[in-house]
Amino acid sequence: MKSAYILPVAVTAATLMLAGCGSSRHEPQAVAASNPTVTYKYHGDQELLQANQNAVTYCNQYKAVPRTVRIDRGDEGRVAVFECVPAATITTVQTINPNTPYPYRTDEELLDTSRSAQRYCTAHGGEAVETVTTAPDGTRNVTYSCR
C-alpha cells in the first residue's frame, strides 16, 4: 500500500526538478504603452480654452501636461483629444506681453498661445486670464493678463 503512494510522489518530484532545470526565467516584456488621454467636446473658442484647462487638471494627477493630439470638426461641434505627457524639467518661457492682442487662425494656434501665456504667468507668480474677441471681418484675437 505504501509503494502505491511513493511512486506518484517520486514521479511528480522528478518532473518538477527536470522542469526547473530546463526552463529559463522569462520576465514580462512591455510591447506597447500609451500615455493617458482625455477627450472633450466643445463649441467655440472659450469652450476650447476651458477644455484645455480641464485637460491640465486631468493630467496633473499623472504629473504631466496636456499635448493636443488632434482636433476633429463635425456637424455637432468639435472634439479635442489631449495626451498627458511628462512635464519637462526645464521649460523655456516665451515672453507674453499682457493686454496685447494675439491673432490666431486655428484652434491649435489658440491652444499654443494659451499654453505660452499660462507658462509665462505661472513663472511670474500668477495665472493667465484669457479674453477672446472676434472682429467684424472675422479676425480672431486673444488677449492675456496675469492675475
State the predicted function of each range.
Residues 1-11:
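Bacterial N-terminal signal peptides that target proteins for export
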Residues 48-147:
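Intrinsically disordered, glycine/charged-rich N-terminal periplasmic/extracytoplasmic linker segments
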Residues 22-25:
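Bacterial signal peptide processing site
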Residues 29-31, 139:
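A hydrophobic alpha-helical transmembrane-helix feature that marks the membrane cores
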Residues 17-20:
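C-terminal motif of bacterial Sec signal peptides marking the signal peptidase cleavage site
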